[in-house]
C-alpha cells in the first residue's frame, strides 16, 4: 500500500498514518485527558478516546444513543439544552444483488425517497435537500448514483446538471463522508442472502457504522434486509433504537 510505504520510509507511527487513522483518532492520541475504550469484539484491544468527545453536539437522539452504545461505552453525554428527538428507521427491502453488493430494489427505494426529499425542500424554498446516501460498498454507491442520474431529474422537474452535481456530492461510501453532516442520512447496506460475509465485514468493528450514524443530525434510516441483518453486531443496536416503524 502506497501510504504505508511512505509512512515506513519516514518512520511515522501507524496510528498517525494508516487506512484506519482519521483526524479524530489523531486528535484523540494527542489528548492527555480521556479514557481507554475496550473493543466491542475483542476486550484485549483498547482505543484511547480524548475528552472532547465526551460531549456530543451533532446528532439528536436516537442517533446519539446508537453511537454512544456501539462506539463509546455510553461514556458520551448530550448537552442538556438539546431536548428534541430525531428519527431512526429501517426500510425492509429485499432483492438479489445484480452488481457485486448492489441490489436494484434498494436503488429504487432510494430514488423514491430522494424524490420526496427534493419536492419537500423546494416547497420549503430551499435549493436542495440536506440528505446523504451512504453505503459500506463502492459498487452500491456507484450503481445508486447511476440510477439516480437516470431517473431523479424527471421525477422532480429540476435541471439535470444541477441534480447530477448534487448526486455526486451527496452519495458515497462511509469513508468519503467523514467530517461531513446532513439533516438526513440513508444507509444502504446492499448485499443479498448469498453475501453474508460482506455484511459481516461491515460490522466487524463499530467504526464504520458509527461514522454513518453520526453523519445524520436529525434522521437516520437503514435500507436493507431487516430479517437477515437486524441481529448482527451493532446493527442490532440500530434496530432496537429505531423509533419509526
Predicted regions and their residues:
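Conserved helicase motor core of SF1/SF2 NTP-dependent helicases
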Residues: 1-245
Amino acid at each position: 500500500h502506497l501510504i504505508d510505504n511512505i509512512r515506513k520510509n519516514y518512520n511515522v507511527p501507524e496510528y498517525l498514518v494508516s487506512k484506519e487513522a482519521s483526524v479524530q483518532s489523531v486528535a484523540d492520541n494527542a489528548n492527555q485527558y480521556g479514557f481507554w475504550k475496550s473493543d466491542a469484539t475483542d476486550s484485549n484491544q483498547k482505543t484511547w478516546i480524548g475528552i472532547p468527545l465526551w460531549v456530543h453536539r451533532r446528532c439528536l437522539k436516537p442517533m446519539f444513543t446508537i453511537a454512544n452504545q456501539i462506539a463509546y461505552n455510553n461514556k458520551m453525554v448530550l448537552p442538556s439544552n438539546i431536548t428534541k428527538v430525531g428519527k431512526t428507521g429501517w426500510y425492509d427491502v429485499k432483492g438479489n444483488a445484480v452488481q457485486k453488493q448492489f441490489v436494484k430494489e434498494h436503488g429504487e427505494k432510494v430514488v423514491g425517497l430522494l424524490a420526496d426529499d427534493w419536492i419537500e425542500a423546494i416547497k420549503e424554498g430551499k435549493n436542495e435537500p440536506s440528505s446523504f446516501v451512504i453505503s459500506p460498498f463502492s459498487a452500491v454507491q456507484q450503481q445508486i448514483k447511476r440510477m439516480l442520474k437516470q431517473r431523479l431529474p424527471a421525477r422532480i422537474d429540476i435541471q439535470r446538471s444541477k441534480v447530477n452535481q448534487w448526486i455526486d456530492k451527496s452519495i458515497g461510501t462511509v469513508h468519503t463522508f467523514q467530517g461531513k453532516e446532513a439533516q438526513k442520512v440513508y444507509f444502504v447496506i446492499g448485499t443479498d442472502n448469498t453475501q453474508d460475509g460482506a455484511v459481516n465485514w461491515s460490522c466487524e468493528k463499530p467504526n464504520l457504522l458509527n461514522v454513518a450514524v453520526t453523519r445524520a443530525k436529525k434522521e437516520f434510516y437503514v435500507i436493507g434486509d431487516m430479517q437477515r441483518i437486524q441481529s448482527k453486531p451493532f446493527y442490532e443496536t440500530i434496530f432496537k433504537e429505531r423509533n419509526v416503524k
